[in-house]
Amino acid sequence: MFSVGSRVQIINHSEPLCNGQYGTIVSMQVAYDGYTYYYAVELDDSLTTCSCIDDELMEE
């Protein structure tokens, strides 16, 4: 599990704009199932935010 402020690389993401990019987690939410976490990652360009799950993130 990651936390707000963590530096990450986005991997295996279906959106080409996000895949392979680096950024910082700016917010997170827990899904209704109580197990899945959704992370908003602001890319280093400070213009783009990508929605990701655990499997799509890797610690920098």
What are the functions of these language-model segments?
Residues 2-60:
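Basic/aromatic-rich interaction segments and small domains that mediate binding to polyanionic partners
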